[in-house]
Amino acid sequence: MEKQCCSHPVICSLSTMYTFLLGAIFIALSSSRILLVKYSANEENKYDYLPTTVNVCSELVKLVFCVLVSFCVIKKDHQSRNLKYASWKEFSDFMKWSIPAFLYFLDNLIVFYVLSYLQPAMAVIFSNFSIITTALLFRIVLKRRLNWIQWASLLTLFLSIVALTAGTKTLQHNLAGRGFHHDAFFSPSNSCLLFRSECPRKDNCTAKEWTFPEAKWNTTARVFSHIRLGMGHVLIIVQCFISSMANIYNEKILKEGNQLTESIFIQNSKLYFFGILFNGLTLGLQRSNRDQIKNCGFFYGHSAFSVALIFVTAFQGLSVAFILKFLDNMFHVLMAQVTTVIITTVSVLVFDFRPSLEFFLEAPSVLLSIFIYNASKPQVPEYAPRQERIRDLSGNLWERSSGDGEELERLTKPKSDESDEDTF
């Protein structure tokens, strides 16, 4: 691998440039998304609009974009004949995309809940727990190996997050920060005003629908009474598991078998179709959602921030798809850590976030654990990455390594023996 890269420095430099560019785009979009979710809330840290409308619109934007590009790809490669007939196996492969779509659907909804309870800085710090869940699924689902240093760094990361949670007990009353006042695009109609006036306590029905009752934790357990777990902490742990499962399964079906050589835009079209389906069912089956859309309209409560959030969420999802297709999950998780630094800085400057001394002492431990994990990639033969070779429909031979961060590589020798094994 190294010799091939050295013999083609131009190709290597372009690959590195594209990798850094993709990572930078993902970081910018992820940071913008968190900030826009926070800015789109009202003064009470609730949402005047239905968050599901943001998700269904972003899925629609992604689907339209991918379908248009897919038609261009199919027309260019003269593959229109593949659209005429569909076997049972193709239908089964198509239905596989419903699983990550459903998980992404849950993940995108939980984000709105989390930021109703936590400061953006605290949310991104606690989201580092996804490194642990992703590493576990890496080992179980994708059969990727981790050495003992990496496992130790994951344990340190977990303990750092627990300590950080305990250190925020003095900020529980103001974790969500302050809300914002902004003008909506559409003024409510008479039927909408009547609908809102009929809500209990003259409150916004949407706001009541999208909040959890206050929960008190550790009221009986004295051993862990100093750890102040709130609803926001529980939700973000659940989100870490869901997002890790979604990304791991998505990477698996993006790269398995013949899917490896299929266009990413065709694959994403299947994923986003189910995304629209699940979000649309949520809007249609939930009575409160139907009543609000019927009386106030689909875009009631939306502002410039929520409209911008639709497009940022869409393009952030596309960037994740490119990372999972051409890189891997660990690159995605490690790039997300840069978002932690950005959001923490913005929270101090904008959201009136005042970190305590414990925060400054414990937050670097989280980032240090991440650095140790990334710097301790196994180099010994025991953990050598497994090589897979796949031939596409045009006869080109491709090679993919299962190691962290390895990219898909085309083998240029047309008559190379596929049974030969590379030595490392």
UniProtKB/Swiss-Prot annotation:
Ranges per topology, Cytoplasmic: 1-8, 75-93, 143-147, 250-263, 325-330, 376-424
Q: Which residues lie on this side of the membrane: Lumenal?
A: 30-53, 117-119, 169-228, 285-303, 352-354
List, alphabetically, the GO terms of the cellular component aspect: Golgi membrane
Which residues of this chain are annotated as glycosylation sites? Answer: 204
Indicate the family of this protein. Belongs to the nucleotide-sugar transporter family. SLC35A subfamily.
Q: Which domain of life is it from?
A: Eukaryota
The record's Gene Ontology biological-process terms are: transmembrane transport
Query: Which segments cross the bilayer?
Result: 9-29, 54-74, 94-116, 120-142, 148-168, 229-249, 264-284, 304-324, 331-351, 355-375
Where found in the cell? Golgi apparatus membrane
Oligomeric state and interaction partners are given as: Probably forms homooligomers and heterooligomers with SLC35A1, SLC35A2, SLC35A3 and SLC35A4.
Task: Give the species this sequence originates from.
Answer: Homo sapiens (Human)
Q: Which reaction does it catalyse?
A: UMP(out) + UDP-alpha-D-glucuronate(in) = UMP(in) + UDP-alpha-D-glucuronate(out); UMP(out) + UDP-N-acetyl-alpha-D-glucosamine(in) = UMP(in) + UDP-N-acetyl-alpha-D-glucosamine(out); UDP-N-acetyl-alpha-D-galactosamine(in) + UMP(out) = UDP-N-acetyl-alpha-D-galactosamine(out) + UMP(in)
- PANTHER family for this protein: NUCLEOTIDE-SUGAR TRANSMEMBRANE TRANSPORTER
State the Gene Ontology terms under molecular function. antiporter activity; pyrimidine nucleotide-sugar transmembrane transporter activity; transmembrane transporter activity
Pfam families reported for this sequence = Nuc_sug_transp
Quote the protein name from its UniProt record: UDP-sugar transporter protein SLC35A5
